[in-house]
Design a protein with these regions (language model features):
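Jelly-roll (double-stranded beta-helix
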Residues: 5, 19-130, 134, 138-212
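Bacterial N-terminal signal peptides that target proteins for export
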Residues: 1-7
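Bacterial N-terminal signal peptides
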Residues: 7-17
């Protein structure tokens, strides 16, 4: 009898957890199961996408299927980005913006500081992916739930802001051994203060064209 009660309670808790997950939407959904499984395997195999790039791996939050499809559609530019990241001393390269040679990619090298959440702006992009790798320090990100967000203003020119529900936002910290990619369906907040004393960071941000 006790075991039945425990099993019943467990099933209720699982049902609640599943419902809570389906009540939120954080990244683009793909219903092709075979494609999703292929993309997850591909994402885990650095040589499949990174070539010579060995400095970092994709963060768990990176949408594997979006990454896989974008890489196939724009392989030459992604390869040039990873080559530049591997061959460049990311700690000493001068800060500022630059155009990656023979590409449409814009790279920003930023010496910056994390701030309290209430001071940070939300954003998403329509025409570009945000590739981000923190090379010094720890950067906290927020991943926004679409269902509880409302837009603020208009696109300017490829950025839009949101009002959001903090309780439904996913937060995670990024370190120099991993990178993040925010595709158009990944609404996000960057440079949020983490739980450490040191909020100084150096981050590389690359704007890569999103191919429909």
């Amino acid at each position: 009898m006790v075991n039945r009660i425990i099993s019943f309670i467990a099933s209720i808790l699982l049902s609640v957890a599943t419902t809570a997950q389906t009540d939120c939407y954080y990244t683009k959904y793909f219903n092709d199961k075979a494609l999703v499984e292929k993309a997850e395997k591909w994402k885990a195999e650095t040589q499949a996408w990174g070539g010579v790039f060995t400095k970092a791996k994709p963060h768990a939050s990176v949408n594997a299927t979006d990454f896989y499809l974008q890489y196939q559609k724009n392989k030459e530019e992604w390869d040039k980005l990873f080559k530049w990241l591997q061959e460049t001393d990311l700690l000493t390269v001068p800060k500022g913006k630059m155009k990656l040679e023979d590409t449409e990619i814009t790279i920003s090298v930023e010496d910056s500081r994390n701030e309290p959440l209430e001071k940070r702006k939300t954003e998403s992009h329509h025409h570009n992916c945000d590739f981000m790798i923190v090379v010094k320090g720890i950067e906290r990100f927020g991943h926004l739930d679409h269902f509880s967000c409302t837009t603020k203003g208009q696109w300017k020119p490829d950025v839009i802001r949101y009002d959001y529900d903090k309780s439904k936002t996913r937060f995670y910290d990024s370190t120099p051994n991993e990178f993040l990619i925010f595709f158009p369906d990944d609404w996000h907040i960057a440079k949020i203060a983490n739980d450490t004393k040191d909020q100084e960071i150096r981050v590389i941000v690359a704007k890569v064209r999103y191919c429909p």
